[in-house]
């Protein structure tokens, strides 16, 4: 999982503490993130994954549901939730955004999480 590796490598490089959970699929990330937030144990949640377009309209519905769900959770709980779900037209585009030797978005998700935690701590 290249996105996860990019994210955890960056957090490890900064000596940050984190916990990794796995979820069944993109749609389930919304309720899973909500449950993580409800534990009140974490300063931030980074949701990582990929939704790749297929031949049906399902892609559009999943993208919309997950995007709306995650943004609603973040606003409702006043907790940073980093939207680390790639939404691409094909696997090649997803790989380009996840490859460690290129612009690994996982690293960017970790950087954003650390920035937001720091910003919230200043409030």
Predicted regions and their residues:
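Glycine-rich phosphate-binding loop
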Residues: 28-70
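Glycine-rich oxoanion-binding loops at beta->alpha junctions
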Residues: 21-39, 86, 91
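A charged, well-structured terminal subsegment
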Residues: 103-123
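Phosphate-binding/catalytic loops
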Residues: 89-103
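Glycine-rich phosphate/diphosphate-binding loop of Rossmann-like nucleotide-binding domains
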Residues: 1-24
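Short, acidic/small-residue loops that bind anionic groups at enzyme active sites
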Residues: 60-87
